[in-house]
């Protein structure tokens, strides 16, 4: 599959994954006649990591034997993939993503999310093109931690919840285009798949059993959500989820992107007066059933510090924030109240 793309590949992965699948990957590349350069990912999707990997690719680091690669193959979770995409754009390489967990919708997107060395969210960057190839081995996904699989459901669930809200204002998507009905259809399909198959799929992944339900949710978590969010638009759920990345308690618990976004969904549902109680409660109950965060306790934020929550609300409400993609005014106070309401409802429904 790589031969049409180039002749030498950068293989970016983390050490545990390399030990797990390294021999298989190397043998496959050798059989295909693809030369390769292995680089270990150092743990965070930072601009410094992007530069470090790029320096190795062009041979300007201590690894002077490294020649220019023409394919970037990123193997692992979303952060590895995001760095691989950035390096590929910097050095005019083709992009191949190989997600080993279905924890978010990064694999298909022409975007990367950046953090600093303290794991705090710094922003996102859009690329001029999408990955040339996305390789997903369902058997690898089903043997990965179930928590990652569920986190992917949180990220994918938000795609329709946010698009449904922000399309009312004709909000531009991340690339500056107008969201299409096709994007909305993909987002809604992902949403419907999760509600119908998500609970069964989680149980199957817990048992490392590959079933049609798991296959459907893998597609929803990666392909459908990825195409949907990128061609559509985001709103409060991601604004809150991104800000939670800066909270020490969430960092200490290793909260995943989709888990933080899930609490953002809960808050957005409490923020939007047009959402019926029946619909809101149905989504809360689904998230509780699969194990997505809907309370501060789920986020490791108890006992709650009101000062921390106020800071989250203030930071989310800044001008230009995704939270302003709703057809109504969103303020720091309304965000604060929505998060408090989400926590209360989550506790009541558990």
Segments the model singles out, each with a brief description of its role:
Residues 1-70, 296:
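ATP/NTP phosphate-donor binding region
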Residues 60-100:
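A short, small-residue-rich loop immediately preceding and capping a beta-strand
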Residues 79, 100-104, 140, 266, ...:
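Acidic, glycine-rich active-site loops and adjacent beta-strand->loop/helix elements
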Residues 89-182:
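A glycine/threonine-rich phosphate-anchoring loop and its flanking beta-alpha core
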Residues 174-292:
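Active-site segments that bind and position negatively charged phosphate/pyrophosphate groups
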Residues 274-350:
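C-terminal charged capping/lid subdomain of soluble metabolic enzymes
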